[in-house]
A protein has these predicted regions:
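Mobile genetic element proteins and their domesticated derivatives, centered on retroelements
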Residues: 6-10, 17, 33-34, 49, ...
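C-terminal domain-tail junction helix/linker
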Residues: 182-184, 208-290
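Short hydrophobic alpha-helix segments
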Residues: 136-137
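Hydrophobic beta-strand scaffold residues
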Residues: 76, 187-188
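Mobile-element integrase/transposase regions
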Residues: 59-126, 144-150, 157-162, 270-290
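RNase H-like two-metal-ion nuclease catalytic core shared by retroviral integrases
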Residues: 25, 164-168, 172-181, 188-211, ...
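Basic, flexible linker segments flanking DNA-binding modules
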Residues: 7, 11-104, 195, 249-258
Length: 290
């Protein structure tokens, strides 16, 4: 049976029997770029990878990146369970909505461990409007006095916020801290006990910090965790695409301060970042940390 007759019987165009997939000239280079970025940023999906590629000058859409992503067997990170909603269906506000930078800051603790099993508590501070991470400070133990010192360092650089949102942890509800905040003009905004979704911006940041940084590192000293955490903070603010900001970083213009008593930042500036296209927060082996 001829090809012409067979195609007529199945009502199929003859051109489909001669079609050959043509690969674009840049297909191999783009594939390498995607796999390199997926290796460097193991928790990023194809949408964030697309944003990084465009920043590098690639004229590529997310559909093409997704096709290569799936063809290469790259795994898209699983979705997190949805948190409690922040607003009702009619648009009325459940809680204070950030309207401009320095309107609402939120802070919370995240726990980690060094290689010897000892606990490290990291105090994270973010601006809810810009999503910028203003501080990650690590200590073995925290008191209200240390929290005041940490907040004062940031306020010298960024100004005083109108509101500070937090849970009801003992360090945050301490009388000395509340008195000091009142003196600066900042108002406290405590969430309801047992309702972490009311501090959703900071909880979301904490999950990214743990997923993209803490879960992939082994820390041998407090100096090491402080240096690497500060580098990750700078990476988060200046490089990492943020989905709610149109896949732009929260503060691409941010730079490391070099003085004003911000000890962790000064330490971080003494060890330059890796010379990678996107400024990975990880460094080469730092003998000084061990």
């Amino acid at each position: 049976m001829s090809e012409r007759w067979a195609c007529r019987l199945v009502n199929q165009p003859r051109g489909t029997q001669r079609y050959h997939l043509t690969r674009r000239e840049d297909e191999d280079a783009l594939t390498r770029a995607i796999t390199d970025l997926a290796t460097q940023y193991g928790r990023y999906g194809y949408r964030r990878i697309t944003a990084l590629l465009k920043r590098d000058g690639w004229q590529v859409g997310k559909d093409r990146v997704e096709r290569i992503w799936r063809r290469e067997g790259l795994k898209v990170p699983p979705r997190q369970k949805p948190r409690g909603r922040l607003w009702f269906n009619d648009g009325s506000c459940v809680r204070l909505r950030p309207e401009h930078p320095n309107h609402v800051w939120s802070y919370d603790f995240v726990s980690a461990k060094t290689h010897d099993g000892r606990t490290v508590r990291m105090l994270n501070l973010i601006d809810e409007h810009s999503r910028e991470c203003l501080m990650i400070r690590s200590e073995r133990r925290w008191s209200s006095a240390k929290v005041i010192e940490a907040l004062a360092d940031v306020m010298v650089l960024k100004g005083v916020p109108e509101h500070l949102r937090s849970d009801n942890g003992p360090e945050f509800v301490a009388r000395d801290l509340r008195k000091w905040l009142a003196g600066t003009g900042a108002k406290t905004a405590y969430i309801e006990p047992g309702s972490p979704w009311e501090n959703g911006y900071c909880e979301s940041f904490n999950s990214k910090l743990r997923d993209e940084f803490l879960n992939g590192e082994l820390f041998y000293s407090m100096k090491e965790i402080r240096v690497l955490a500060e580098r990750w903070r700078v990476h988060y603010n200046t490089i990492r695409p943020h989905s709610s900001l149109g896949y732009r970083p929260p503060a691409p213009e941010a730079r490391l301060p070099k003085s004003l008593g911000y000890g962790e930042v000064e330490t971080a500036t003494r060890f330059p970042l890796l010379h990678t296209p996107h400024g990975d927060y990880r460094s080469t082996k730092i003998d000084a940390l061990h």
